[in-house]
UniProtKB/Swiss-Prot annotation:
GO terms for biological process: translation. Belongs to the bacterial ribosomal protein bL34 family. It comes from the Bacteria. GO terms for cellular component: ribonucleoprotein complex; ribosome. This is Large ribosomal subunit protein bL34. The keyword Ribosomal protein applies. One of its GO terms (molecular function) is structural constituent of ribosome. The gene is rpmH. Keywords: Ribonucleoprotein, Ribosomal protein. The lineage of its organism: Bacteria, Pseudomonadati, Pseudomonadota, Betaproteobacteria, Burkholderiales. InterPro entries: Ribosomal_bL34, Ribosomal_bL34_CS.
Amino acid sequence: MKRTYQPSKTRRARTHGFLVRMKTRGGRAVINARRAKGRKRLAV
């Protein structure tokens, strides 16, 4: 059986990247929450 996680940098960026997060209100909320928490990496 094939494993469920088949890494791909392109797909990772397209679904969880910074630009994708900034597109929606909820995504911006995620970025802001991570900024407030002091995360080193905001998105992928």
